[in-house]
């Protein structure tokens, strides 16, 4: 049986570093909620069986009317960490008929620059891979190590083999669920899905990502994201 495709959008974070009064995924950029751009990109990929958005149980900011016309489901099963939210979302996908051998693409709600083309490139590259992988970019900047709490450079780190992880991250549902559960049992709270897969002894692949697919994190990121999204809208 051909594996199906599912998308999972963990959307339970508060965005504390963004300096916003509301969670950043609901901030308006170029006339739309930031989350809208992620949902629209996956909605444009009709090959996906379902896109599941994981909200915090007490989220009072989500308004489905802002995303009218887009195909997705919502479950209020977010946990205390990204890892917990993703695990709860993976378990929730069973409600939509997802099987262990099916693929899931986990994507940050705060990466509005994702495009259907990048999603399809990732899927086409990894659909026959035994493990899966992520979109990522080779590190371009020189990296300096600074001790925690300090402001003095300890050393310069070689960047030759370093890549900056992005999302989506694409893995088999069963493999990813088992990897996260193992990490939790062993007391590890990992910051992305590939880390859990690596922790289980597997080797994910990297697929070239895009600079426009950056994560909106700090206050100054909103203006850059808005400029990119507005330009894309004007070009279409």
From Swiss-Prot:
Pfam families for the chain: IspD
GO terms of molecular function: 2-C-methyl-D-erythritol 4-phosphate cytidylyltransferase activity
Biological process according to GO: isopentenyl diphosphate biosynthetic process, methylerythritol 4-phosphate pathway
Marked site positions, Positions MEP for the nucleophilic attack: 159, 215
Catalytic activity of the protein: 2-C-methyl-D-erythritol 4-phosphate + CTP + H(+) = 4-CDP-2-C-methyl-D-erythritol + diphosphate
Annotated site residues (Transition state stabilizer) in this chain: 17, 24
Matches recorded under InterPro entries: IspD, IspD/TarI, IspD/TarI_cytidylyltransf_bact, ISPD_synthase_CS, Nucleotide-diphossugar_trans
Keyword ATP-binding included in the entry's annotation: no
Pathway where this protein functions: Isoprenoid biosynthesis; isopentenyl diphosphate biosynthesis via DXP pathway; isopentenyl diphosphate from 1-deoxy-D-xylulose 5-phosphate: step 2/6
Classification via CDD domains: CDP-ME_synthetase
PROSITE patterns assigned to the protein according to its UniProt record, in alphabetical order: ISPD
Gene3D superfamilies: Spore Coat Polysaccharide Biosynthesis Protein SpsA, Chain A
HAMAP family for this protein: IspD (MF_00108)
Protein's UniProt name: 2-C-methyl-D-erythritol 4-phosphate cytidylyltransferase
Lineage per the UniProt record: Bacteria, Pseudomonadati, Pseudomonadota, Betaproteobacteria, Burkholderiales
């Amino acid at each position: 049986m051909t594996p199906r495709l599912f998308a999972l959008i963990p959307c339970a974070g508060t965005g504390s570093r963004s300096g916003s009064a509301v969670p950043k995924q609901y901030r308006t950029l170029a006339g739309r909620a930031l989350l809208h751009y992620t949902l629209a990109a996956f909605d444009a990929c009709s090959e996906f069986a379902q896109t599941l958005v994981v909200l915090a149980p007490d989220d009072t900011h989500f308004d489905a009317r802002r995303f009218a016309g887009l195909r997705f489901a919502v479950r209020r099963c977010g946990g205390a960490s990204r890892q917990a939210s993703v695990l709860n979302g993976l378990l929730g996908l069973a409600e939509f008929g997802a099987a262990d051998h099916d693929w899931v693409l986990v994507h940050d709600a705060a990466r509005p620059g994702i495009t259907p083309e990048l999603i399809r490139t990732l899927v086409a590259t990894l659909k026959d891979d035994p493990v899966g992988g992520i979109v990522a970019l080779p590190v371009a900047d020189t990296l300096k190590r600074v001790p925690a709490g300090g402001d003095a450079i300890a050393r310069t780190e070689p960047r030759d083999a370093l890549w900056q992880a992005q999302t989506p991250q694409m893995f088999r549902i069963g493999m990813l669920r088992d990897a996260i559960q193992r990490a939790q049992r062993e007391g590890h709270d990992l910051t992305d899905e590939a880390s859990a897969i690596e922790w289980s002894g597997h080797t994910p692949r990297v697929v070239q990502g895009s600079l426009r697919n950056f994560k909106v994190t700090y206050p100054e990121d909103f203006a850059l994201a808005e400029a990119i999204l507005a330009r894309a809208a004007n070009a279409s």
